[in-house]
């Protein structure tokens, strides 16, 4: 455990949109089952673990890379749009637009692309885990079936953090 880390406090770097759509609810449930747990959240999932004093990070990636990790979501993507949205495409780094399609909007992240689609600005391809809530609520429609993707949301950490008792407990809970 690094200086400044406590056995009941988790410092987690997580994309805002993934926290809002998937992780937040699960962290709340873990905290309810584990009295005294505290969270420190940061948005820079690619932050240096030592400099940011991180326990864990959530990354949209093909795998854990040189870190230890577990996939939190299946590697699936889906094309979505709001009811009555234009046919314009919303792009973001890593979004596989159809051949010949040109982006009318370029977003910086899948979360911005999802927000743009929810606003009726067009259609986009996003990780299924981000869109599931909006699809279930009827705020978005799927324009086709989910399809395999190269990337999923991974919970990662360097080996020393990954082996710690507190991290193992949260990893076990989130991957159950």
Predicted regions and their residues:
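Conserved strand-to-helix beginnings and helix N-cap segments that scaffold or border functional pockets
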Residues: 23-24, 128, 167-168
């Amino acid at each position: 455990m690094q200086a400044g880390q406590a056995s009941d406090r988790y410092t987690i770097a997580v994309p805002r949109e993934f926290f809002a759509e998937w992780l937040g609810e699960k962290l709340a449930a873990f905290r309810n089952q584990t009295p005294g747990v505290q969270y420190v959240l940061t948005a820079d999932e690619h932050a240096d673990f030592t400099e940011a004093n991180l326990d864990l990070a959530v990354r949209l990636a093909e795998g854990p890379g040189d870190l230890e990790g577990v996939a939190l979501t299946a590697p699936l993507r889906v094309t979505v749009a709001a009811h009555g949205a234009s046919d314009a495409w919303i792009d973001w780094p890593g979004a596989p637009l159809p051949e010949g399609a040109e982006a009318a909007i370029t977003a910086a992240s899948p979360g911005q692309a999802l927000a743009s689609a929810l606003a009726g600005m067009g259609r986009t391809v996003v990780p299924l885990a981000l869109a599931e809530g909006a699809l279930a609520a009827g705020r978005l429609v799927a324009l086709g079936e989910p399809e395999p993707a190269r990337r999923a949301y991974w919970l990662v950490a360097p080996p020393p953090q990954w082996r710690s008792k507190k991290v193992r407990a949260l990893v076990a809970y989130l991957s159950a």
